[in-house]
A protein has these predicted regions:
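Periplasmic peptidoglycan-binding/tethering modules of Gram-negative envelope proteins
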Residues: 1-54
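Periplasmic OmpA-like peptidoglycan-binding domain that tethers envelope proteins to the cell wall
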Residues: 30-38, 50, 56-126
């Protein structure tokens, strides 16, 4: 599988964790920006060239706000990415989405920079 340098993937547990650092969301938002769509388009190309792989799309948030709202927001982030890929032509059977809310931060939520990193979507290839 040929992968962009910015993309580290876990494929059948042979690679390390997967994250797209540039796929970060504004606070309290699950709207895809133009820059987010460009990153997702890279995933689309990978899926187009490698029809044997599937993707788990994981949504995450920072810890600002209520836990339940953050959980729903993270689910909506993952679903927005999934729906975008489906609109591009990826079969829904190759995509799963899940939201974790604030349960799996990449960085401690101690400042705005760390919190921005935690408002993200990760892609797991399986």
């Amino acid at each position: 599988i040929t992968l962009p340098l910015m993309l580290q993937l876990r494929f059948n547990n042979l690679f390390t964790s997967s994250i797209l650092p540039s796929l970060i969301f504004p606070s309290a938002s699950f709207e895809l920006t133009d820059s987010s769509k460009k990153v997702i388009d890279e995933i689309y190309l990978i899926l187009l060239k490698n029809r044997e792989i599937n993707v788990l799309i994981e949504g995450h948030t920072d810890n600002v706000g209520e836990f339940r709202k953050n959980l729903k927001l993270s689910q909506n982030k993952a679903l927005a990415v999934k729906n975008y890929l489906i609109q591009r032509g990826v079969s829904a059977t190759r995509l799963r989405s899940r939201g974790y809310g604030e349960k799996r931060p990449k960085k401690p939520n101690i400042n705005k920079k760390s919190m921005a990193i935690n408002r993200r979507v990760e892609f797991i290839i399986y």
